[in-house]
Amino acid sequence: MDRYPRSDSIVQGRTGLQTYMAQVYGWMTVGLLLTAFIAWFAANTPAVMMFVFSSKITFFGLIIAQLALVFVLSGMVQRLSAGMATTLFMLYSALTGLTLSSIFIAYTYSSIASTFVVTGGMFGAMSLYGYTTKRDLSGFGSMLFKGLIGIVLASLVNLWLKSEALMWAVTYIGVVLFVGLTAYDTQKLKNIGEQIDTRDSATLRKYSILGALTLYLDFINLFLMLLRIMGNRR
């Protein structure tokens, strides 16, 4: 079942779509900035690092909390208030910052910054393509989803195998996958923006937050894959 509402009777103009997409990108940017700040702050605060990484229970508890927030936002957005949806997205972004704070310990600041710039360029190019192309990308959805499941399973298996070859295979395949997902998701969000009633501020905010989460996940995962390739370890 499609989690987005269908409003075929509502004719949305170009202004409504542009407003929706602007809010999607705006909230995604806010989420990324919050994640970056929390990650940097945690990495420079020993007490926070001890709290996050001294216990596997704490670390994996944070991971589970992140997954729960994604499922709640994705599956229950219509039942949430606009304020609650925004709060949950901000909470998710902050928790992601905590779990990713170790990259500031593992990699040099300059390589993190350069990887972020490259990620931004790749993401921007593919998102622009997804928004402007006349080609229907919906046919790639099944393949991209299967690829996503594949790299998740391979990553879990590699926790035990500890295979460097498998790790690099997952990394390079992951780059291709999230580049594709960026274009696919952007086109999907564009279609959603043409269907929802953007004149309703609550509806606009809730689906902008959900769209922001979608593109945020694409960006973060693409960044992490590229950081493995481009990052200079300390």
Predicted regions and their residues:
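A hydrophobic alpha-helical transmembrane-helix feature that marks the membrane cores
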Residues: 1-234
